[in-house]
Amino acid sequence: MARIAGVDLPRDKRIEIGLTYIYGIGLSRSQEILAETDVNPDTRVKDLSDADVAAIRSEVQNNYEVEGDLRRLEAMSIKRLMDIGTYRGRRHRMGLPVRGQRTRTNARTRRGVRRTVAGKKKASAKK
């Protein structure tokens, strides 16, 4: 089993797809990496030679931010927005949509599950 950037790649998948299991690498970037290292994208992970795995590993480590480093970078960027008090930072802090989406209805994914609010009791009509 090939281990790249701390992730075990699935053995039976094509290397082009297997690389997408690494956080920060999608299909386009996977194809880019394979073109740089001259590895056939249709090769199965289990059929890769040690030299191929080493070439891919060094390409990923030297030229791309992936996994923990990328997650840390994203968290620091969001924290910076919150610290300097930008509109986007405030939206992140409040757990609301950041990019201008409506919130009167929808936005359930970002806001979470509905919490019911106890309504006022109707006062009995006095006549």
Swiss-Prot record:
| Residue ranges, compositional bias (Basic residues) | 101-127
For the keyword Chloroplast, the answer is no
Choose any GO biological process term that the UniProt entry carries and state it. translation
Q: Give UniProt keywords alphabetically.
A: Ribonucleoprotein, Ribosomal protein, RNA-binding, rRNA-binding, tRNA-binding
Task: Tell me which GO cellular component terms the UniProt record holds.
Answer: cytosol; small ribosomal subunit
Q: InterPro entries given for it? A: Rbsml_uS13_C (IPR027437), Ribosomal_uS13 (IPR001892), Ribosomal_uS13-like_H2TH (IPR010979), Ribosomal_uS13_bac-type (IPR019980), Ribosomal_uS13_CS (IPR018269)
**What biological function has been recorded for the protein in this entry?**
Located at the top of the head of the 30S subunit, it contacts several helices of the 16S rRNA. In the 70S ribosome it contacts the 23S rRNA (bridge B1a) and protein L5 of the 50S subunit (bridge B1b), connecting the 2 subunits; these bridges are implicated in subunit movement. Contacts the tRNAs in the A and P-sites.
State the oligomer form and interacting partners: Part of the 30S ribosomal subunit. Forms a loose heterodimer with protein S19. Forms two bridges to the 50S subunit in the 70S ribosome.
Family classification: Belongs to the universal ribosomal protein uS13 family.
What is the protein name for this chain?
A: Small ribosomal subunit protein uS13
Protein's gene: rpsM
